């Protein structure tokens, strides 16, 4: 990087600013010239050691250093925070410099001379104060304030660490087994080294400009966006998040709760500083333009349209007292988490038995939740079961997501409530019936447990903020991409997803782990293990395979920020190439989806076995051959059948003409019936099953024609035969050759422009065979159906024919629901449009990548 960098003030003045040194080099490198302020800072830092020599009581030292640390930490977060806030909102520091003319050569005041001397001493004799804007010079002075406060903050913290470590004759080295002391020192050292690497990497990435909050004073040209490189790809705000793990490493080494509390105190104030000072300024300087912000708000509002335009219940957040499901959720939570354990602890004599009951309840509820949610998602992903049912019953597909959200949230609440209730019972009974696996370090366990619980809450909040309620409730499984804004057409890489592809896989069980750490019993460990296994299965074998199907493997398999940094810094280039996703567009097998592929194959094979007939079509035809009546005086011949490779066939709904021939003076009560071959093949000379009104008299004529149509026909595919019966009885005189009734396939297009052609086919091949009076596509179908004897049965019959002929599943009362909505004005044209819409939704739910692979196969 060039030493000369371009900057621009907020007034629009451009300038070139020279290279500056980092804090450590400036203060502690003896080869670097020290200004007066820098010498004062170094002196003050060294003076901290005087406490060790002037105060003999170590506890007093600890108290003094803790007080000093609190002072400097408050100076950091509230002192520097106040200055930066004023500069960000009002340019107060620059305006004070301008008002006092601190950098004006002609100003000979004491403060002006001190400030100018300091700047000149920092930058060297070649630096021209007047050639640089006031904002840059003010920043140089501000840096010295930062140097003093930050270094004093760190040095006083280290003094607290040392004072606590050497307390009671170097207590950090004894009082524990050797292995535990060694482990503590090693882990603490690793955290410190990692913290050091984070700080160094962050400084190398953002340089002094951002390290000293330079963007509060001026902008660096060609640096308009936030930098996401190095450690900034691994952690959000690494200086304030991972940049403080070293504090906890020092607490481990010092073996001191005092150091731990001080570290937590400092870290907490730093997060307050981030929230109140840094983030507002970052949003103002680097935030998205107003139209993009508005678009994000629109996406969130679009999300609400899938949930009745009201924010859905997530846990117990967004609780709405006017929503029945919320009330039930609250009652369930209070019942399982509070009421049952409290009453049980007071009224139960056998505490151990009750504890086992609560454990079994927690296990059963978690197992039930795992089975139901995973099952629903698998069925929806592979067979679109839920969406198909909603569309088939004329319900908006959006309702499927809303109802699943209620189911999902209710079951999740039940699992957490039963788990919490079990542990509340343990605490109320003071663990009388169960021993802890780990008994020591109670305060450390509570601290780490609460930290894990808070981590899960924060991660879940970030997930909802990044992917919205739509993503939180697996909206990709239920809603096609075309139904949402273009921003939903790709996986989110913002928020926590910038750093981790599946944050819930790592942090989704943190809360349960936290409770287990606080109350480490075997029951909790078993439930925690079950939770982890379910979480792993759901993400890797349910969610991931579906995401690949919808968005493509390349997009799903993109490296997260953490993985990029790990590869870059820890893996050789030769190994990195093995992890790269192929850039070609050819579909490839997914190594992590072998289980799902095997599962799909098993289900498809099972379904084919269950739906295939027990006896083949050819065998049924052979069984029906009329070998028993070769010399009979009676005969049946079927007219108008279409030839096929094995047996002639007709189509469902089309009238069938049967010619009969009988001897003279036969009974006028002879009759002909239509039967399934599979139902009658075991009895040749007598029919033992009912014809269900699919019959007609022959009359006294010796020959004639009987037409079977509408209600006298079967509406199922299969092999059939006609039987000639004698004298109104069930004695068989002749059986016709077998024939097949097939389903006429009607292709439903995906384009609305082809609705008229689809309507014509529906009317010709379905409605004209079932009802009368529907002469065109604009005539309400109720006109024809209302003339039938059983209106409801006709509605259901037509719906069944539509499902079988088009392949688009509709409920048996689909037409009834549509007629009710339109006031009996629903037409064949409307039906065609509705079928196209259903087909389009189901098609889009398959996912672009899945359909592309299917075509190639």
From Swiss-Prot:
- Name the pathway it acts in: Phospholipid metabolism; phosphatidylcholine biosynthesis
Q: Which GO terms describe its cellular component?
A: endoplasmic reticulum membrane
UniProt xrefs under InterPro entries: Phopholipid_MeTrfase (IPR007318), Phosphatid-EA_MeTrfase_fun (IPR016219), SKICH (IPR041611)
Q: What class of enzyme is it?
A: transferase
Q: Which GO terms describe its biological process?
A: methylation; phosphatidylcholine biosynthetic process
**What Pfam families does the record point to?**
PEMT (PF04191), SKICH (PF17751)
* TM region positions: 35-55, 64-84, 146-166, 178-198, 234-254, 257-277, 327-347, 357-377, 404-424, 437-457, 512-532
**Protein's cellular compartments:** Endoplasmic reticulum membrane
Segments on the Cytoplasmic face:
56-63, 167-177, 255-256, 348-356, 425-436, 533-857
The task this protein performs is described as:
Catalyzes the first step of the methylation pathway of phosphatidylcholine biosynthesis, the SAM-dependent methylation of phosphatidylethanolamine (PE) to phosphatidylmonomethylethanolamine (PMME).
Protein name in the entry:
Phosphatidylethanolamine N-methyltransferase
Origin organism is: Clavispora lusitaniae (strain ATCC 42720) (Yeast)
Its ancestry begins with: Eukaryota, Fungi, Dikarya, Ascomycota, Saccharomycotina
């Amino acid at each position: 990087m060039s030493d000369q960098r371009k900057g621009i003030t907020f007034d629009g003045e451009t300038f070139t600013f020279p290279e500056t040194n980092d804090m450590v080099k400036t203060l502690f490198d003896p080869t670097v010239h020290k200004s007066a302020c820098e010498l004062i800072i170094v002196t003050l830092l060294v003076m901290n050691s005087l406490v060790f020599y002037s105060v003999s009581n170590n506890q007093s030292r600890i108290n003094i250093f803790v007080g000093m640390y609190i002072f400097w930490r408050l100076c950091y977060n509230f002192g520097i925070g106040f200055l930066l806030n004023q500069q960000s909102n009002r340019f107060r520091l620059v305006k004070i410099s301008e008002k006092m003319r601190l950098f004006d050569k002609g100003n000979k005041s004491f403060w002006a001379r001190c400030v100018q001397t300091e700047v000149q001493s920092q930058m060297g004799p070649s630096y021209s104060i007047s050639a640089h804007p006031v904002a840059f010079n003010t920043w140089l002075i501000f840096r010295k304030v930062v140097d003093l406060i930050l270094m004093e903050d760190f040095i006083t913290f280290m003094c607290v660490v040392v004072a606590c470590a050497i307390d009671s004759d170097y207590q950090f080295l004894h009082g524990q087994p050797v292995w535990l002391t060694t482990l503590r020192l090693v882990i603490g050292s690793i955290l410190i080294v990692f913290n050091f690497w984070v700080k160094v990497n962050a400084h190398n990435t953002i340089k002094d400009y951002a390290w000293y909050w330079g963007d509060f004073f001026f902008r660096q040209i060609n640096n308009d966006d936030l930098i996401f490189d190095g450690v900034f790809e691994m952690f959000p705000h690494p200086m304030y998040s991972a940049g403080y793990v070293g504090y906890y490493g020092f607490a481990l080494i010092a073996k001191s709760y005092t150091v731990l509390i001080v570290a937590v105190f400092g870290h907490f104030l730093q997060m307050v500083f981030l929230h109140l000072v840094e983030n507002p300024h970052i949003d103002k300087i680097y935030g998205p333009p107003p139209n993009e912000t508005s678009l994000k708000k629109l996406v969130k509002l679009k999300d609400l349209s899938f949930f009745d335009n009201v924010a859905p219940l997530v846990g117990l957040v967004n609780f709405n007292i006017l929503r029945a499901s919320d009330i039930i959720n609250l009652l369930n939570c209070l019942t399982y988490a509070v009421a049952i354990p409290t009453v049980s602890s007071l009224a139960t004599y056998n505490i151990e038995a009750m504890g086992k009951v609560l454990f079994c309840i927690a296990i059963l509820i978690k197992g039930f939740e795992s089975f139901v949610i995973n099952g629903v998602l698998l069925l929806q992903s592979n067979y679109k079961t839920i969406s198909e049912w909603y569309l088939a019953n004329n319900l908006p597909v959006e309702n499927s997501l809303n109802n699943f959200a209620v189911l999902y949230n209710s079951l999740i609440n039940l699992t957490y409530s039963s788990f919490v209730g079990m542990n509340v019972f343990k605490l109320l009974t003071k663990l009388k019936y169960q021993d802890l696996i780990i008994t020591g370090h109670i305060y450390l366990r509570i601290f780490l447990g609460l930290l894990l619980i808070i981590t899960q809450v924060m991660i879940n909040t970030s997930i909802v903020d990044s992917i919205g309620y739509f993503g939180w409730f697996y909206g990709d499984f239920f809603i096609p991409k075309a139904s949402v804004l273009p921003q939903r057409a790709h996986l989110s890489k913002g928020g926590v997803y910038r750093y981790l592809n599946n944050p819930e896989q790592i942090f989704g069980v943190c809360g349960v782990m936290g409770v287990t750490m606080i109350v480490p019993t075997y029951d909790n460990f078993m439930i925690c293990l079950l939770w982890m296994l379910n979480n792993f299965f759901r993400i890797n074998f349910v969610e991931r395979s579906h995401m690949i199907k919808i968005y493509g493997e390349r997009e799903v398999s993109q490296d997260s920020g953490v993985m990029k940094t790990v590869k870059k810094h820890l893996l050789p280039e030769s190994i990195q190439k093995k992890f790269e996703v192929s850039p070609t567009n050819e579909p490839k097998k997914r190594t992590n989806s072998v289980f799902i592929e095997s599962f799909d194959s098993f289900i498809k094979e099972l379904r084919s076995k269950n739906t295939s007939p027990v006896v083949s079509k050819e065998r049924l035809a052979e069984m029906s051959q009329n070998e028993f009546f070769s010399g009979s005086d009676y005969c049946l011949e079927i007219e108008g059948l279409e030839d096929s490779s094995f047996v002639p066939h007709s189509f469902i709904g089309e009238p069938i003409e049967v010619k009969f021939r009988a001897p003279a003076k036969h009974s006028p009560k002879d009759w002909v019936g239509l039967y399934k071959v599979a139902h009658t093949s075991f009895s040749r000379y007598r029919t033992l099953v009912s014809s269900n009104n699919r019959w007609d008299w022959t009359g006294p004529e010796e020959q004639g024609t009987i037409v079977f149509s509408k209600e006298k026909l079967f509406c199922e595919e299969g092999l059939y035969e006609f039987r000639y019966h004698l004298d109104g009885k069930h004695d068989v005189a002749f059986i016709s050759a077998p024939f097949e009734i097939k389903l006429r396939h009607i292709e439903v297009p995906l384009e609305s422009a082809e609705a008229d052609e689809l309507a014509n086919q529906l009317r010709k091949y379905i409605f004209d065979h079932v009802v009368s009076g529907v002469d065109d596509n604009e005539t309400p179908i109720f006109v024809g159906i209302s003339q039938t004897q059983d209106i409801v049965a006709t509605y259901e019959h037509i719906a069944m024919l539509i499902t079988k002929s088009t392949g688009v599943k509709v409920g048996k009362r689909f037409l009834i629901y549509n007629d009710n909505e339109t006031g009996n004005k629903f037409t064949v044209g409307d039906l065609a449009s509705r079928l196209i819409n259903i087909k389009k939704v189901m098609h889009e739910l398959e996912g672009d990548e899945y359909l592309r692979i299917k075509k190639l196969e």
